[in-house]
UniProtKB/Swiss-Prot annotation:
UniProt subunit comment: NDH-1 can be composed of about 15 different subunits; different subcomplexes with different compositions have been identified which probably have different functions.
Function: NDH-1 shuttles electrons from an unknown electron donor, via FMN and iron-sulfur (Fe-S) centers, to quinones in the respiratory and/or the photosynthetic chain. The immediate electron acceptor for the enzyme in this species is believed to be plastoquinone. Couples the redox reaction to proton translocation, and thus conserves the redox energy in a proton gradient. Cyanobacterial NDH-1 also plays a role in inorganic carbon-concentration.
Chief subcellular location: membrane
Pfam families hit by this protein: NdhL
Transmembrane regions: 5-25, 43-63
Family of the protein in this entry: Belongs to the complex I NdhL subunit family.
Swiss-Prot/TrEMBL catalytic activity: a plastoquinone + NADH + (n+1) H(+)(in) = a plastoquinol + NAD(+) + n H(+)(out); a plastoquinone + NADPH + (n+1) H(+)(in) = a plastoquinol + NADP(+) + n H(+)(out)
Native source species: Synechococcus elongatus (strain ATCC 33912 / PCC 7942 / FACHB-805)
Encoding gene, per UniProt annotation: ndhL
Protein name: NAD(P)H-quinone oxidoreductase subunit L
Amino acid sequence: MTVTLIIAALYLALAGAYLLVVPAALYLYLQKRWYVASSWERAFMYFLVFFFFPGLLLLAPLLNFRPRSRQIPA
């Protein structure tokens, strides 16, 4: 393997992690913690959404997380 091929594979792995892997994990994290997060955690969530926005845009047409349905006591 040449050094150029190793560098290209490293760039491809980092791009895949930035655009697919981390945003998918972020979607799951946001789905679990959105309604119970503290203010500091909510600010951290906003930062993560800002930082990984391109990957979230790529995954948005494929994922559709609707809000939880409310339980209204009768």
